[in-house]
Amino acid sequence: MMIFFQTNPTTIFVFLISLILSSHYSEVDAETEFSYIEGSGTGPEDWGQFGPLCGNGTMQSPIDIQHVQVSPTLGELQRHYKPAPAVLVNSGHDIAVEWRQDAGKITINGTDYQLRECHWHSPSEHTFNGTRYDLEIHVVHQSSSGKFAVVGIVYKFGRPDPFLARLYNQIRNIGSGEERNLGIINPEDIMFDSKEYYRYKGSLTTPPCSENVTWTILKKVKTVSTIQVKALREALDEGNESNARPTQDTNGRLVQLYCPRRNGGST
């Protein structure tokens, strides 16, 4: 059964205007993204609007690593990487290398996590007894069940990082929202040259801040040049140049330290 309404030019005009306004505000809402700008309404203190766990989670990351339990039984990090095609992506809030084919995996407690991407934060997100370093890379892996395993490496200013050196020109010339083909990238070029690492359970450090992440933070501090960090910062959207989330409460979580030649205990 069809019902017909009587219309006139004024009614049609009002209807069209309402459609246009509705469409406009829908697009604005969809495009609203989180930022790192304090007081902007979209900064870290307001991320709860993008994911409830960002505001009320109890296992959030990053953290300040202080007291740890030495756990030699954790074993060395099991990496099984291989070269694969990758692209450089500028999201506006970070620069990432995304592998578009199988680039290998890491294995933790018998679970395989496939390598997805790596990205950078400056300054570092994790701190160590209150010390914050100049840069941190997150190498992100995901299991078949959707859980994450992220390997973090922190850097201080010094000699250039070889992996960033290879990407330097592309980083300098990539705009926000763009991606660039990188060809074949070997994940081992990141150089995971530390057997000692910290391990704890936490979250993604950006919305939705999901609390399904096994964190592995390498203990060794590497070096990066000031111009490399400058390139990473200048490529991002205005206000996001410093893209480190403040440290979160540990809420009594256990932080383990793997040292190959040390007995167990707390430090």
Regions found by a protein language model. Name each.
Residues 2-267:
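Alpha-carbonic anhydrase
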